[in-house]
From Swiss-Prot:
This is BPTI/Kunitz domain-containing protein 4. InterPro entries: Antistasin-like, Hirudin/antistatin, Kunitz_BPTI, Kunitz_BPTI_sf, Prtase_inh_Kunz-CS, TFPI/VKTCI-like. Residues 146-196 form the BPTI/Kunitz inhibitor domain. Nacreous layer of shell (at protein level). One of its GO terms (cellular component) is extracellular space. It comes from Margaritifera margaritifera. Coiled coil: none annotated. SUPFAM superfamilies: BPTI-like (SSF57362), Leech antihemostatic proteins (SSF57262). Pfam families: Antistasin, Kunitz_BPTI.
């Protein structure tokens, strides 16, 4: 046998193990006598038995620079990292219906605990058509229409009406033109006071 050919390709492959009476015994199989004289930078492709065949392996995964992913990256069919982020895998989802949503755990996955009602039930003395919202979006007992400016409108009728003056905190008389009113337009002073005065 030519020494060069012998040096280029000779392999013994371990193809598996099995247990007999509690002890582990290795089964070995000599890989076929394929002779390959080509030099492969990344080694040879292995067959189904784990023995090299006369075909060079592709280059390892390309070096990729990706933005950070909170849950890691998707791995492609070749075992290489992609720049696609893995989605959050929450596993089983709770089947309890929560009208205001579920409280998330530390990973952001929904738990079986419901969020509380975000806004308190209002107990206002006055009824508003549109309530003023607070900083977290919950309605207050203030009426939006009371915050609107006095609006006479473009028409020329002189209809006595009342509006709530935010600056003075009082309901004042004005003459409405008869068209294009806003919400701060009341027929009687008592209506204005009931709706807008605290």
């Amino acid at each position: 046998m030519n020494l060069l050919v012998f040096f280029v390709y000779l392999x013994v492959c371990v193809i598996g193990s099995h247990s007999i009476x509690g002890s582990q015994q290795l089964s070995t199989k000599k890989c076929g006598g394929a002779i390959c004289a080509m030099a492969c930078t990344y080694g040879f492709v292995l067959d189904k038995d784990g023995c090299p065949i006369c075909k060079c392996r592709d280059a390892p995964c390309p070096l990729v620079k990706c933005l950070p992913c909170k849950y890691g990256y998707v791995i492609d069919d070749n075992g290489c990292q992609t720049c696609e982020c893995k989605p959050l895998d929450c596993g089983l989802v709770c089947l309890i219906y929560c009208p205001y949503g579920n409280i998330p755990d530390e990973r952001g996955c929904p738990t079986c605990f419901c969020r509380p009602r975000p806004c308190k039930e209002l107990e206002c003395e006055k009824k508003c058509r549109n309530n003023v919202l607070d900083e977290i979006g919950c309605p207050t007992c203030k009426c939006k229409e009371c915050l609107e400016p006095k609006k006479v409108g473009p028409c020329r009728a002189l209809i006595p009406r009342y509006f709530y003056d935010v600056w003075s905190g009082k309901c004042k008389k004005f003459y409405w033109g008869g068209c294009q009113a806003n919400g701060n337009n009341f027929k009687r002073k008592s209506q204005c006071c009931k709706r807008c005065k605290s």
